Amino acid sequence: MRTFFCAVLLCLHVAANASSESTEMKRAIDTMQEVYHVSFVYDSALADVTPAGRPLPDKTLAENLNIVFGGTGIKWEIKDEYVLLFRQNKYTFSGYVCQDNGESLINVTVYDKTTRTGTLTDEHGFFSITLPEGKHVLRVSYIGYEEVVKELDLQSDYFGTIYLKESTTALAGVEVTANLNDPLFTTQTGKVSFTPELLNTEFSLLSSPDLVKSIQNLPGVSSGTELLSGLYVHGGRNDENMFLLDGTPLYQVNHLGGLFSAFNTDVVKNVDFYKSGFPARYGGRTASVIDVRTKEGDMKEYHGTFSIGLLDGRFQFEGPVIKDKTSFSFGMRRSWMDLLTTPVLWIANRSFSDKNIKTRYAFHDINAKITHRFSDWNKLSLSVYSARDLFKSRVLQQFPEGYMFQKYEERDENTFHIRWGNLSVGLNWNGQLTPKLSGNVSLVYARNLAKYSFLSDESYYEQDKRVSMERMQRSNYSTIDDVGYRMEFSYRPAASHHIRLGSNYLFHMYHPQRIASQDIRETAGIADTLLSAGEGRYRGSEISFYVEDDMQLTEKLRVNAGLHAVLYRVTGATYHSLEPRLSVGYRLFDWATLKASYTEMSQFAHQLSNSYLNLPTDCWVPSTSRIRPMRSRQVAGGIYMKLPWNLSMDIEGYFRTTDRMLEYDTGGSLTLPADNWEKWVRVGKGKSYGLEASLAYRHAKNVFQASYTLSWSKQKFEDFYPDWYASKFDNRHKLNLMFRHKFNNRIDAYAAWTFRSGDRATVPMQYVENPSLPGTVQPSDAAGSWVYEKPNNITLPAYHRLDVGINFRRTTKRGFERIWNISIYNAYCRMNAFYTQVERQADGSFRGKAIGLFPVIPSFSYTLKF
């Protein structure tokens, strides 16, 4: 908090110095009075307005009056030897920016060339800009779309919808002029936005575009275990990332243990990723925020996308229900793995006379949304998201009488069944309340589920009559149910202020574990049954309020200041948190901006895991009376530059601390005890710091990006180890290189090379055998003990790989686009470390041996856009 107030005082000091520059208006007036021998009559408050320019020699009085006051909101009138100054009336131009099919667009720049002020559309495509009365020329631009220039003569408040057409010549990613979402113009540090075009032109693992794997390539982000969808941002852990899908929080965002993320990029409209400089409207996690917005659907025509790849297929379709009034968007993705393995197992089972194996794995995710517009400024939408993974395995074996000297025939059955996933439903209203005020209210429900069961049945038969049976059955059920609302308001009193305020509420129902077991022994018709069960259940409510103001204090200084307040109640405990947020941007030159930010974040939900594999056995637990909420503080700052030759460069540093981190320790067990789980966790703290740099070149045919991260990530759990030690994913160096080339409108290719320092692992230094005392018998577990220097004491070999791919495009006579993609993962077959084996040397010392699993992996996909 002390750092926050120091930053505020510094900001006020800079603002005070900047306001002193407003005396330029007084000097300009004095100069014209002296040169033209006139007297100015005006309200003294007008002297605080920054002049549009300075008086020039060899100009008439009227010409210089236009130079000084043009676009400032000050009107002038010459009467004899007097110049009368008075404020112009101001009016608000507001509305929505949409594609020509009615789909709203996010982060569109609306810029007034007359006053040299502008704004961005929000997450619902809404904008509002207050301008002086009179004539204005507005430029509306967005990457990948044709720019629209609109001339206005404002004599009253005006509402309008602006439609943009997709560009047929510009390559997605090419810069547009006056892009106010560019880091050069925003205050936030560590923010990156993704459009659908950008997501679908990134490297695609197994030829399937993936949002999380695109984020993994950013500086300051570690991917964790190879091929999995881990996100370790600025030293944070995988559970410290807030995923929002149309405003609804998600807990499980992976398929197949992380091989695929749970986002179908065909339905994604925009993604905002924050790793520092968090605005006050976000909360609930401590490391990052991923705000995903999905399509509403085409209001005019039907169209869609179909894609089939090596392991999965995707389908997306959208169109009008009532033209220009109601639209729908539907997307589905499903894996093919069960269809591929079924014939293989059928052939294998035919070769076994005493064994039958049935295995099935499949996943799907479904996105559905329907939107109705009551008017141009009032709409309602209902969205549903469902994601599910399913794995089944059943092995039947028969052993004839006499096998291994058995008296009876034996029949064994082992069944394993696991499913996990998400379900979320959101009802959202969005509308314009006044020309300067818009509102958004959502009712949300989310459910996270993980369930697995195991059955082992051994039966013995004599002449097809069962004589005995042993059955063991285990089941585990874990759920989280959230229900609540989100209320957001956006108020733009002037072009220099954008105020956001709102409230979020969630009622949490946690069931971390519901464990049941059953053991049955039956002999000669007499059964002996043993039952046991356990359940953990928690209820909690979380309500937050926030306010933030994005302020343009001077032509060069921009500030985003806000406060996020949270009240959290769970059985037996109540917590509250005040989280200040401050981001400052200062325009050093036309081509460079200096930024700094300070943020505090709290987290009331924790994921307990004994691995880094994103397993469904991982479960979520709330903060309790014994486990306090996690808290992080982060300072970040850097310089952002637009250089000649289509180059851009960013350099950013950060320092982050985390208190009350949790670490799960049950001696290697993957399942959490249902009761008293709090005694199985350690509480500690962490710190991370580093420097990030990125360089990008964008041209119509060539795109090159390079990023480098130098970072340290440490943690301390005093009950486990008394000093600071490196985190598992303390990757000192990380380098990403990407190049994409467009040969023509039909062929484009890309290559991406990734390098990072190796992950950390723990290897014992020696093994000490306990002495055996005469006349005593040592238990088997007391034979000796391992001696460790410290946790994560070795660094595995460096990780690096090359991915390449090529797209072949063709447009049919009917206007359909066909895309063939061929990709190669790990092109030079680097066997990077996936896990570590500990080997004992001849001299008694130990060494870790890195084991790699993933060689070169080719893949393909076919996409049809219709």
PLM-predicted stretches and their roles:
Residues 29-36, 72, 78, 83-84, ...:
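Short, acidic, small-residue-rich periplasmic hinge/interaction motif at the N-terminus
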Residues 69-70, 120, 146, 182-239, ...:
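Periplasmic N-terminal accessory/gating domains of Gram-negative outer-membrane beta-barrel systems
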Residues 114-126:
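Short, acidic Ser/Thr/Gly-rich low-complexity loop/linker segments typical of extracellular
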Residues 311-335, 350-394, 417-445, 493-494:
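Transmembrane beta-barrel wall of Gram-negative outer-membrane proteins
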Residues 401, 449, 516, 590-635, ...:
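Surface-exposed extracellular loop regions of Gram-negative outer-membrane beta-barrel proteins
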Residues 482-486, 534-538, 624, 628, ...:
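Outer membrane beta-barrel strand-and-loop segments of large Gram-negative receptors
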Residues 555, 655-657, 677-763:
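Gram-negative outer-membrane beta-barrel transporters
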Residues 659, 746, 755-782, 797-803, ...:
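C-terminal beta-signal and adjacent terminal beta-strands/loops
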